[in-house]
A protein has these predicted regions:
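PRPP-associated nucleotide enzymes
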Residues: 1-128
Length: 128
């Protein structure tokens, strides 16, 4: 199943439960964007009021505590890091997905065709 993003995880958790109740054997999730690690400072695209509403931040808080440095968050944003892979596995388990794979931010930037200096990526990497 493809969705635009996973913010809190509520909607996909409910959809996944519905699919399993109605006979699905597996549920594979492919969000259209990288994991959201920061709440948007610029647009009100979500009902989330706190970064702790984000499923990524809740998983990180379970692993690291709530006060996490920017350096640690950058490691979780790096799709080549062990922390990133473990975060995805925790999200997959928590939401009962068979598999979960996100787009990489570097691939997303390349595919858009806009100069990276004109593209806001704050919610994914915390960079303004």
């Amino acid at each position: 199943m493809i969705d635009d993003s996973i913010v809190r995880g509520t909607q996909l958790r409910e959809t996944t439960e519905f699919l399993y109740r109605n006979g699905a054997k597996e549920v594979h999730i492919r969000p259209a964007c990288p994991p959201l690690l920061y709440g948007c400072k610029y647009l009100n695209f979500s009902r989330s009021k706190s970064e702790m509403d984000l499923i990524t931040r809740r998983v990180i808080a379970k692993r690291e505590g709530e006060n996490v440095s920017d350096k640690v968050l950058a490691d979780y944003a790096d799709p080549n890091s062990a922390n990133y892979k473990e975060m995805l596995e925790e999200i997959r388990k928590e939401l009962n997905f068979t598999s979960l794979k996100f787009h990489r931010l570097d691939d997303l930037k390349a595919s858009i065709g806009i100069s990276p200096c004109k593209l806001c990526t704050y919610c994914w990497d915390g960079k303004e």
